[in-house]
Amino acid sequence: MNILQLAFHTSPFNEVGKNDGGGMSIYVQQISRHLSYNHNVTVVTGEKAESFKDNNLEFISLNIFEPELNVEDKEVYLQEFKNKLEESLDLKNFDIIHAHYWLSGLVAKEISNELTIPFIFTSHSLGVFLDGYNLSLIHI
């Protein structure tokens, strides 16, 4: 199975406890490593980081924004993230998309609708309901 993991707002392979790196980063990193024992896993972030490939696990940074940028300010980069994702990968080759955090979920839902690829969404927090977010983007 070919699995696409989207972690738009933070790199799961950057230092935990710094910037937006925390529990979600650990979760995405660990689940991706374990899934890669039997599947091809591609993890993509918009945060600037060093990309790598390790057997069945590939990590791709689209290098859109600095790690120090506040998560509330990353929303404006969603369309650029989706565009670069479509330019960088043949998305039709993925069997499933797992989106982490609500920002990644917005992109995964669009791709899923366009290419009829099933997607899983894990919220990891209720941050979307905090002040400062553009809730008009969310359509269930």
What annotation goes with each model-predicted range?
Residues M1-F52:
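N-terminal subdomain of nucleotide-sugar transferases
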Residues I3-L4, S112-G132:
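Active-site proximal beta-strand in glycosyltransferases
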Residues H9-N14, F65-L69, V128:
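A short, flexible beta-alpha/helix-coil linker loop
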Residues N14-K18, N70-E72, D131-S136:
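Short acidic, glycine/proline-rich loop/turn micro-motifs
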Residues K53-V71:
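Conserved nucleotide-sugar phosphate-binding/catalytic loop shared by glycosyltransferases and other
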Residues L89-S104, A108, P118-I120:
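Short N-terminal targeting/anchoring amphipathic segment
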Residues I138-I140:
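Conserved small/polar residues in nucleotide/adenosyl-binding loops
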